[in-house]
Amino acid sequence: MATKIFSLLMLLALSACVANATIFPQCSQAPIASLLPPYLPSMIASVCENPALQPYRLQQAIAASNIPLSPLLFQQSPALSLVQSLVQTIRAQQLQQLVLPVINQVALANLSPYSQQQQFLPFNQLSTLNPAAYLQQQLLPFSQLATAYSQQQQLLPFNQLAALNPAAYLQQQILLPFSQLAAANRASFLTQQQLLPFYQQFAANPATLLQLQQLLPFVQLALTDPAASYQQHIIGGALF
């Protein structure tokens, strides 16, 4: 890159002084300095006077110089704009190399706020693009809390009953499936209502409850299909 910049500067100098071109010996260093335009900085001129200097010195001189973008430069040669853009690119790279370590050190020293900012970044973008959707997301925890609160309010009488009278609460827990069944299927609920006295009787006597569990399929069959239940009784008597 330094060689290209040096070539551009030489072409610029030759194009600016083509009318006053003079042949000089090769060993002389004066032609290069005399061919340079007067508006170039003295630092570049000093670099060009000594051809033994390395291209890295030339690159440093161009990066440190401040070439003004005057109309005269644009009229004489469009190559100066390319030189200026190269200088700006070099400065931007140097600035980036200086700033990036500082940013990394700040991020490592204060990682928690940096991670929090990264987490909140989608929400900030959403609030900018769609404020209504952002507001709904902000209200979402309150909606969930309101739902849980309403459920607690529904269960509050049962909790109070369980604290005051555990026996009555246990009875309500036993009857709760029947209440749900009544809401879903009224015919099945009426069937369960017919069996309710048996449940209450067997709840007081666990041994009888076990017998009921064994006889429950036959009882349900007798309620749904009396003819089939009668046939099962006949078959059972014949077997025994």
Curated annotation (Swiss-Prot):
The keyword Signal applies. It holds the Pfam family Zein. GO terms for molecular function: nutrient reservoir activity. InterPro entries: Maize_Zein_Storage, Zein. The alpha zeins of 19 kDa and 22 kDa account for 70% of the total zein fraction. They are encoded by a large multigene family. Structurally, 22K and 19K zeins are composed of nine adjacent, topologically antiparallel helices clustered within a distorted cylinder. PANTHER family: ZEIN-ALPHA 19C2, ZEIN-ALPHA A20-RELATED. This is Zein-alpha A20.
